[in-house]
Amino acid sequence: MQQTKKLTHSDITIAVMSGPFLQRGEPALVSKWYRTKMALACGVDLVVELPYAFSTQKAETFANGAISILNALHVSEICFGSEDGQIENFYNTISVQKNEEETFNRLVKQFMNAGNSYAKATSEAFLHILSSEKNIDMSQPNNILGFQYIKAILMQNSSMQAQTIKRFASHYHDETFNDQHIASATSIRKQLFSENSSFTEIEPFIPKATASLLASYKQNYGTLHNWEQYFSFFKYKLMTMSPEDLRHIYEIEEGLEHRILSKIQTSSSFHSFMEALKTKRYTWTRLQRACTHILTNTTKEEIHCANIEQHAPYIRLLGMSQKGQTYLSKNKKKIELPILTHTKTFDHPTLHIDRKANSVYFSIMQEPLRAQLLKQDATHHPIRYDETTAKFL
């Protein structure tokens, strides 16, 4: 956050945040309201939600939704972390892909026909057409997402400028702490769910406010969220589905339904199920997203109605500092998308999916807590934060 503010000289900062389920196809560690508090306490001025229909998607769709929201809020610059760290290289890579589009598409098809996943095929195609040091490594996950952010800016004819910060020490998929001060989200999550885990081990790697709020969530609700807690629900759902039922679920295609129904029979945990399910063609993340859609019963028809090829249909405001509130007041007449401060009276196909996802997310809670949290999610007004006193209002 400090590096972003230093690099962009921003007046205010806006974060677009996933809701209950994340882009890599897993439940968020804590609710979006607690994560909003974390963001505000760390210096963000406005926190808005990226709808489920965009947030649990491949990088291209995820980026398109996020950029459309930022564009609607009249953001002048975005900043993202990347393995490359040189923004010029992203623009060079986009230019090469555009100029070599026919060759690129042919290579992607060729590598997919050889049994590779789309992500792997795309990475291999880039390796073949990108030879200059001025291009980015498209096998790296944060480079891929940054590439899609900039493509979305260009596709939406936005005047937004992009900046990037190089990731140091820890890599996206690292499962262990390799540095004294920097750790990947993957390694932090693994530590939190390890035997005899405590928050002490992760405290050097996260802000104090984040550590405090994580501990508070676990104390108040008795749990942090991961896939294993949902596995019994997930397995039960699959045991009651036919291949035809499963084919209606978003991202279930090319016979994947038969493999899923076969592997679930002998799986005793989500991790063992994923180990049995993954192949060269289907990456772990791609499969986790498909499993998330099964868990939330998100169908192809629902995603079609959400019209994800277009821009996000609304802005769900989750939290704001005093500076953020002032910014919204000054610019609200220019913002063309509806800004939702709660969702109890608004209706849209995209919001219908969000409501289902929230319901599933809280399903692991005991009653009456589950019902209370679900009701609060619809009626919850944006969290307000006084940055001068560092207190929530």
From Swiss-Prot:
Entry's localization field: Cytoplasm
Cross-referenced SUPFAM superfamilies: Nucleotidylyl transferase (SSF52374)
InterPro entries in the cross-refs: Rossmann-like_a/b/a_fold, tRNA(Met)_cyd_acetate_ligase
Family statement drawn from the similarity comment of this UniProt entry: Belongs to the TmcAL family.
Gene Ontology BP term (one): tRNA modification
Residues that bind ATP: 81, 142, 167
NCBIfam families to which the protein is assigned, alphabetical: PRK13670.1
EC nos: 6.3.4.-
UniProt keyword terms in alphabetical order: ATP-binding, Cytoplasm, Ligase, Nucleotide-binding, RNA-binding, tRNA processing, tRNA-binding
Top-level lineage group: Bacteria
Disulfide linkage: none
Catalyzed reactions: cytidine(34) in elongator tRNA(Met) + acetate + ATP = N(4)-acetylcytidine(34) in elongator tRNA(Met) + AMP + diphosphate
GO cellular component: cytoplasm
GO molecular function, one term: tRNA binding
Pfam families the record matches: HIGH_NTase1 (PF05636)
Name of this protein: tRNA(Met) cytidine acetate ligase
Biological function: Catalyzes the formation of N(4)-acetylcytidine (ac(4)C) at the wobble position of elongator tRNA(Met), using acetate and ATP as substrates. First activates an acetate ion to form acetyladenylate (Ac-AMP) and then transfers the acetyl group to tRNA to form ac(4)C34.
PANTHER family: TRNA(MET) CYTIDINE ACETATE LIGASE
